[in-house]
Structure formats: C-alpha cells, structure tokens
C-alpha cells in the first residue's frame, strides 16, 4: 500500500557513490548550494503566486556568509529559492537553509495572504561535486473494482477522517486526522469489527511508514500503547480547549512528526480495511433468483 511519505524523510543521491562518499567523509566547512522547490497548495503547481524575474541580486541570509537567490519559472512566478552557504555536510546545509527559509516563507505568506509550501529540495556539495535530491514519491496506479458498494452510512464519518489524513497537506494535519481514526477504533461502534483489541505493530508497518528509524519502542506494541505514544504529539498540537496551538518545529522535529503521522495513517487504514472485511464476512448471501 502507498503511504504519503513526507519529503523530510531522506535525501536521495544523484551522483556516483564515490562523490557521495567523499562528501560524507569530509567534515570541513565548505560551500553548498541548497535549492527549495516551491508549491502552490491550492493549484498544486510548483510555483507561487509571487512575481519574480531573472537577474535579481543575491540577498543575505543566516548563518553568516549565507545568501539566497530568487528563481522564476517561464511564467515569471517564483518557483525556487537557492541558498549558497558554508556547512560541514549536506544534512547540515539543508537544516541551516531550511531554518532560514521557513520564517521567510511565513513572512511572505503573512504579507500577501497566498498559500505557500515547500515541494522538495536539492543539495549540492560544490567541493566534491556531490548532489542529492528529495521530492515527493509518485506511486503507480492501482487497480480497483469501480462497482464497489458505497461505504456504510455509520462507517462513513470514520473513513472521512482517514480521507482527511490521506489528503492532508502537512504531517501535523495528517497525524491529527489519523489519530482520530485510531481513537475511534477503540470505542466507536462503527469500528467494532476492526480487530483493534488484537492489533499490534509489526515490522512491516514500521518499514512501510518509515518509522523503523525512530528510537521509540514501537515493535509489537498494541493499539492502546500506540495511541498513548502518539498522544503527547497530538496534545502539543491541540490545546485542551480544542484550539490548534502555535507550534513551529525545526527540520528534525518535522521529520519525527512526519514518520509518526505515517505510522498512524498506515494503522488507521489497516483498521478500516479489517472493519470492511468483517462486514463483508457477516453480510447475508444474496438471495437466489426465483426459478434458478
């Protein structure tokens, strides 16, 4: 099954192994380029509704010695921001550049009121000619019987929560929606056949969600334990009065949140599938046609 992996999870090498090895082995400060592809969350186009033009001068950034350039597409809209900065590794360069861009993006959003998001990024080590890229995973098409019966009315609200998780534009929204499905599986009558009481986290779940890399003791835990582990993340995003809290994670924090959201999302899907399978087993067989 496909999990909406968040692009914060990894950097994929684009050059040969030797250039990547040399870059990783070098701990000295040197010049890196970090490019951030930008996306309009409404149209899903990889551009922002901000007019830009070629040839604009580089602007100063943080840390000292860093700068960034504005890169338009053919339509004259901002499509990429490229940072030039000193760092000791590709990961450090990405984290430093992201830490500078994120509050800038918020300032632009607050000023013009248009949706803005980071679609992906690329990193280049100018000394060792090593390059990495991270962009959203594009899954292959899946087969489906389009004559499938609609979801039962009592189950539809739970599946709609799962729809929100799968369609979520960010890890926090995905975790909140998936967490609601997990909670429903424990006590909502529409999920009585989901097998929530016997579910446990498997290695397969951890691998497919990417959560296998987390230090938390996840293997083999029951659903109730998973909910307990996720609750602090949920509660720091939503206050006791149900209002979303202002939380701004760094890149490492966003990665952890993304992997936990992936796991919650995957488990939510497994529970809904189990509920649907139980209902199919319990459904009465269709009556034989008269005279057959």
Swiss-Prot record:
Pfam families: MauJ
Source species, domain of life: Bacteria
InterPro entries: MauJ (IPR035383)
Metabolic or biological pathway, per its Swiss-Prot or TrEMBL entry: One-carbon metabolism; methylamine degradation
Protein name: Methylamine utilization protein MauJ
Species this protein is from: Paracoccus versutus
């Amino acid at each position: 099954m496909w999990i909406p992996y968040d692009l914060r999870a990894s950097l994929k090498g684009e050059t040969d192994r030797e250039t990547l090895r040399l870059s990783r082995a070098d701990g000295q400060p040197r010049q890196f380029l970090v490019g951030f592809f930008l996306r309009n969350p409404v149209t899903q186009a990889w551009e922002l509704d901000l007019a830009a033009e070629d040839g604009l001068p580089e602007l100063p950034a943080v840390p000292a010695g860093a700068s960034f350039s504005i890169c338009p597409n053919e339509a004259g809209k901002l499509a990429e921001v490229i940072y030039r900065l000193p760092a000791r590794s590709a990961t450090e360069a990405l984290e430093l550049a992201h830490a500078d861009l994120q509050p800038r993006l918020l300032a632009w959003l607050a000023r013009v009121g248009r949706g803005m998001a980071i679609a992906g990024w690329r990193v280049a080590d100018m000394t060792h000619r090593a390059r990495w890229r991270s962009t959203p995973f594009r899954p292959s098409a899946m087969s489906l019987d389009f004559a499938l019966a609609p979801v039962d009315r009592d189950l539809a609200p739970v599946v709609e929560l799962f729809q929100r998780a799968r369609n979520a534009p960010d890890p926090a929204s995905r975790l909140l929606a998936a967490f609601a499905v997990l909670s429903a599986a424990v006590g909502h009558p529409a999920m009585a056949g989901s097998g929530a009481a016997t579910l446990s986290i498997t290695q397969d779940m951890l691998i497919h969600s990417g959560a296998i890399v987390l230090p938390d003791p996840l293997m083999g835990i029951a659903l109730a334990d998973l909910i307990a582990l996720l609750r602090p993340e949920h509660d720091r995003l939503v206050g006791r009065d149900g209002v979303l809290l202002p939380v701004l994670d760094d890149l490492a924090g966003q990665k952890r949140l993304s992997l936990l959201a992936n796991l919650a999302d995957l488990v939510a899907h497994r529970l809904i599938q189990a509920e649907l399978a139980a209902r199919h087993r319990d459904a009465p067989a269709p009556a034989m046609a008269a005279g057959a």
